[in-house]
Amino acid sequence: MEHAATLPQTSRRPATPLTGTITVPGDKSISHRALMFAGLAVGETRISGLLEGEDVLRTAAAMRALGATVERTGPGAWRASGPGIGGLQSPDDVLDMGNSGTAARLLCGILASHDIFAVMTGDASLRRRPMRRVIDPLGATGAVFAAREGGRLPLSVRGAAEAMPLSYRLPVASAQVKSALLLAGLNARGITEIEEPEPTRDHSENMLRHFGAEVEVAAHGTGKLIRLRGQPELRGADVVVPGDPSSAAFPIVAALIVPGSRVTIGGVGLNPLRTGLFLTLREMGAAIEIVNAREAGGEPVGDLIVTASDLRAVDVPAERAPSMIDEYPILAVACAMARGSSRLRGLAELRVKESDRLAATLAMITANGVKAQVDGDDLIIEGGGARGGATVATHMDHRLAMSALVMGLATETPVTIDDARFIDTSFPGFLPLMRGIGAAIEAAA
């Protein structure tokens, strides 16, 4: 879906501290996977807390087009069932994945090992993103992909009639590539083995077990070795989706940098492979308290109490990147407001996000008066506050848009973004939620 009119927004220092108790939308990674696994399983799955952003709705539509039953039964409540492993059908029309790189890459894995033909496209942003690192290893299943230069969408896939299991070492740690290969392995006879150089988010492995697949995970050097037995009988299993820690990052940093603020965020997912930002912010002196720790749907969950804090600079090691890969733009905002010089290491992966997120993050903070530079794959930020006053080009990147609006809550003069429409891809309701705790965000004049 291509969007029409833009939606510029401006944020400024609020007159009073941010306060209140909120919840953030369901975890995007888990929501995508819940719909996909439910659409492959025999029997009904009931999903609660599903993120109903544009990206996840694309996954729901794609699974319907492939023959699964997927329907909404209430706010965040969905019901899905599938034909079983190997039972998907060729879609009647092109699969449009909108802005969702996660949906597109994971779906390539499903399509590769099913004897079906499909064509996939996306919006202008997604069509610029490289898919080669997913479709190249998937070719070893016997699937045939045809794509534009660089493996970019639109692409077609003729899935393998008899898919071969994969044995593959990821050259770069990537939960999306790993998950695509595991999804392909579901309909391959034999054992699929994937070696990752660093641990990445393990929602796919957790959900595979939840739906009845046989998956083994073992430490392997600095990373992990995952082994999946193909062609299991997946059975429907209810899923509770926790609040997305990547979405919680925005009100968390806002509460930290607006003096006097205190905000509680309920039901946030605390998977240890997703909480690198929380660890980093605590190293910076952030007052983030976890209370009511519990488990929901096989994932650790807790409530976060965040209090405004005097932040100090931090040196973030490259090996932490997989656990916070989506949070670097908002971390850059926190570093800009901190005392001292911060260095965020090993950010090459940001260059192939919705935008060149490394270059765009640098442009966002420097345009607003922050001294910063890219050194190789590292981002160096001189803290001490930001002047503000700039209009930030969001490049159709939802996380960049939200980060810039949070930054404007603590700058000397307001910050404007050129377009807030794409925020709904991951965080529907972001603007009213932030206004509800006292954030001064309004339509740009």
From Swiss-Prot:
Positions with a binding annotation for 3-phosphoshikimate: 28-29, 33, 174, 176, 326, 353
Origin superkingdom: Bacteria
Gene Ontology MF terms in the entry: 3-phosphoshikimate 1-carboxyvinyltransferase activity
EC number(s) per entry: 2.5.1.19
Cited Pfam families: EPSP_synthase
Record keywords, A-Z: Amino-acid biosynthesis, Aromatic amino acid biosynthesis, Cytoplasm, Transferase
InterPro entries: Enolpyruvate_Tfrase_dom (IPR001986), Enolpyruvate_Tfrase_sf (IPR036968), EPSP_synthase (IPR006264), EPSP_synthase_CS (IPR023193), RNA3'P_cycl/enolpyr_Trfase_a/b (IPR013792)
Polar residues composition-biased segments: 7-22
Record text on subunit structure and interactions: Monomer.
Annotated protein name in UniProt: 3-phosphoshikimate 1-carboxyvinyltransferase
Lineage of the species this protein comes from: Bacteria, Pseudomonadati, Pseudomonadota, Alphaproteobacteria, Acetobacterales
Protein's gene: aroA
